[in-house]
Amino acid sequence: MLLEEVCVGDRLSGAAARGDVQEVRRLLHRELVHPDALNRFGKTALQVMMFGSPAVALELLKQGASPNVQDASGTSPVHDAARTGFLDTLKVLVEHGADVNALDSTGSLPIHLAIREGHSSVVSFLAPESDLHHRDASGLTPLELARQRGAQNLMDILQGHMMIPM
């Protein structure tokens, strides 16, 4: 990787991390920075973006950023959005092809991460498309994880989706 490529990747990642959609647009449209340019840590702007800024995610995705890029631990932007509870950003990612059944290095789906953090709106959004029978590295399905955590509200959401015939 050339130093010049890293510099533009750092600039795009920095703007995305700050949630600066105007600078992201400028870099993508005027300077023609590739939306998947890597920063000095080998991450793309979508991986380091401010997840509370769905406009940044939308701009990167509209310009061709990969919604399923994973870091060394197998974490993708959809995992991060689910874990942090940013539903609007998660919706943008999914609308642009993010895989809600992607596994991270612990075998967790994004819905597992949302359950661990207690994000009921994220669980409600992910449940219809998630593999609710998938077991993470601890051997737990999403429902079993919710039960283990004593999260009755999440259990109710999951059970409602498991009763719907496919």
Swiss-Prot record:
Keywords: Acetylation, ANK repeat, Cell cycle, Cytoplasm, Nucleus, Repeat, Tumor suppressor
Biological process terms in GO annotation: autophagic cell death; DNA synthesis involved in DNA repair; negative regulation of cell cycle G1/S phase transition; negative regulation of cell growth; negative regulation of cell population proliferation; negative regulation of intrinsic apoptotic signaling pathway in response to DNA damage; regulation of G1/S transition of mitotic cell cycle; response to retinoic acid
Primary location class: nucleus
Modification type N-acetylmethionine: residues: 1
SUPFAM superfamilies xref list: Ankyrin repeat
Compartments where located: Nucleus; Cytoplasm
Annotated ANK repeat ranges: 41-69, 73-102, 106-135, 138-165
Top-level taxon in the UniProt lineage: Eukaryota
InterPro entries: Ank_Repeat/CDKN_Inhibitor, Ankyrin_rpt, Ankyrin_rpt-contain_sf
UniProt GO molecular function: cyclin-dependent protein serine/threonine kinase inhibitor activity; protein kinase binding
An example Gene Ontology CC term for this record: nucleoplasm
Similarity field: Belongs to the CDKN2 cyclin-dependent kinase inhibitor family.
Record's function text: Interacts strongly with CDK4 and CDK6 and inhibits them.
Assembly behavior: Interacts with CDK6.
This protein's name: Cyclin-dependent kinase 4 inhibitor D
